[in-house]
Amino acid sequence: FNMKKIVKRIAAMGAAVMMMSSMAIGASAANSYNLHYTKGAPSSDNVCEKWMYGIKAQNNGYLKSTCKSINTSGKFSVLANGYRSSSHTINCGSFDIWNKGTTNWKNSNYKKGYSYDVVAEFGVSGGYTNISKYVSSASASGSFN
């Protein structure tokens, strides 16, 4: 009776279970984002953008998103830019999700039933790169559908 073999087998089973659960979580969270920024924190701790692929438009003219955001200082918005998933070079325009909550932002380029790649990102005055000038702490979470 070999103890090492049993330990290895248990470890392999544990890894397989962990992989399966993380895959399931990944699939359900494919269209959701959780962004956060804290001034002074290491950049690896700040999540300023997330790409989501193949989000199917449910309506003509806009993609719908739910967004909740917390902003402790300064002006803040989450920007979302959509691109046709068939070609990343065709820009489908952009819309803003403000920290007051969201509505359906109009954009005539979106077509119902087509899939789009979307990026949700922190943005201040037109770009998420200068967020540190205006905001000391902010977070946003939501999903596209």
Feature annotation, model-predicted:
Residues W51, K100-K112:
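Exposed aromatic-hydrophobic patches
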Residues K68-S77, Y128:
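Extended, low-complexity, turn-rich repeat/linker tracts enriched in Gly/Pro/Ser/Thr and Asp/Glu
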Residues G54-A57, C67-N71:
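Non-cytosolic beta-sheet module surface loops
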Residues T38, H88-T102:
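Solvent-exposed serine/threonine-rich low-complexity stretches and specific carbohydrate-binding patches
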Residues G126-N145:
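Exposed low-complexity, polar/acidic, P/S/T/G-rich flexible segments that act as propeptides
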Residues N59-S65, N109-Y128:
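Noncatalytic modules at the cell exterior or secretory-pathway interfaces
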Residues F1-K56:
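N-terminal prepro-regions of secreted/extracellular proteins
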Residues S73-H88:
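Short, surface-exposed beta-strand/strand-loop-strand elements in extracellular ectodomains
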